[in-house]
């Protein structure tokens, strides 16, 4: 131990979607490295449980990332209570699967709203912080940003969108010394992925991927790489590292996926009917319950 403070020591870091899964793991990793963490999510009690496990100072805010006014309010409260954020991780996300033609329009739209619009609202709320601190914004994306897959149209569309959004922000804020990075992930061991595996069509689609592409990575491992990218202000981070190579062949991926889908989907449909999954995982169910409560 040298006693030398790391780049996150004493800094304020914001994580959305922090109540569980990758968001909670990123919050723990940030806290382990000396950051004061602001946790944002839909589940107040679950956020508090995460907060209470962190080794360093942290506070939590219940918020829907698609609510402009609430996110602006949270950003003001973070500044007042903790100080300006030096790092923001836009991690909040939802997923649903199944055939597009039979998908529930409101559920499909909600995935786009949370994953893409929610990321934009998060950035808008915290850009004043990052301008002040010359901070860093990490946009969580996916292999789905690079290559789309059938039966995951909303998720793939949203992740392609957040990748482009991240590139646009990086170019726009570079002269202000605000860093923007994009985190490309493959399968991460969260309740969302475990829930997806309960649906035959999604489980079979993943099983038909090449072995390296279907491997599931622990959330803690992914979080460690994401936080290292925050410390180093990386323009991009890939977990696993081989995902970077897919950027070189992304133009060839759509026809390959189309050919494979044309061959495999009829066989899968004979095994089990294709049905919409609804929002996946405990986070998806919490989001649906939160919206029902707001409407009721």
Residue locations for each model-derived region?
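Substrate-binding pocket helix/loop in short-chain dehydrogenase/reductase
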Residues: 99-100, 104-109
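The beta1-alpha1 cofactor-binding region of Rossmann-like NAD(H)/NADP(H)-dependent oxidoreductases
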Residues: 63-73, 105
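Conserved glycine-rich cofactor-binding loop
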Residues: 12, 19-20
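Residue(s) in the substrate-gating loop at a strand-loop-helix junction
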Residues: 142
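SDR active-site lid
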Residues: 175-241
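Conserved glycine-rich Rossmann-like NAD(P)H-binding loop of the short-chain dehydrogenase/reductase
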Residues: 33-49
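Active-site helix of classical SDR
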Residues: 123, 158
């Amino acid at each position: 131990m040298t006693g030398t403070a790391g780049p996150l020591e004493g800094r304020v870091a914001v994580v959305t979607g922090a109540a569980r899964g990758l968001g909670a793991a990123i919050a723990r990793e940030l806290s382990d490295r000396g950051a004061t963490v602001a946790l944002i999510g839909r589940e107040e009690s679950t956020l508090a449980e995460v907060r209470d496990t962190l080794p360093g100072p942290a506070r939590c805010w219940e918020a829907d990332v698609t609510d402009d006014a609430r996110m602006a309010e949270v950003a003001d409260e973070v500044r007042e209570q903790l100080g300006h954020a030096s790092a923001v991780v836009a991690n909040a996300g939802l997923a649903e699967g199944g055939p597009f033609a039979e998908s529930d329009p409101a559920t499909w739209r909600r995935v786009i709203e949370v994953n893409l619009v929610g990321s934009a609202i998060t950035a808008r709320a915290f850009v004043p912080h990052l301008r002040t601190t010359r901070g860093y914004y990490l946009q969580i994306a996916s292999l789905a940003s690079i290559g789309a897959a059938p039966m995951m149209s909303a998720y793939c569309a949203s992740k392609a969108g957040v990748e482009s959004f991240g590139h646009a922000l990086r170019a726009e804020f570079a002269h202000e010394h605000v860093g923007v990075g994009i985190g490309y992930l493959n399968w991460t061991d969260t309740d969302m992925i475990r829930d997806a595996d309960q649906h035959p069509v999604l489980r079979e689609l993943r099983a038909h991927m090449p072995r390296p592409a279907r491997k599931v990575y622990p959330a803690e491992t992914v979080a460690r790489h994401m936080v290292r990218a925050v410390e180093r202000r990386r323009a991009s981070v890939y977990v696993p590292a081989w995902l970077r190579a897919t950027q070189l062949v992304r133009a060839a991926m759509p026809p390959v996926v189309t050919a494979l889908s044309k061959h495999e989907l009829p066989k899968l449909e004979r095994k089990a009917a294709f049905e919409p999954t609804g929002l996946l995982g405990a986070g998806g169910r919490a989001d649906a319950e939160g919206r029902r409560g707001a409407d009721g």
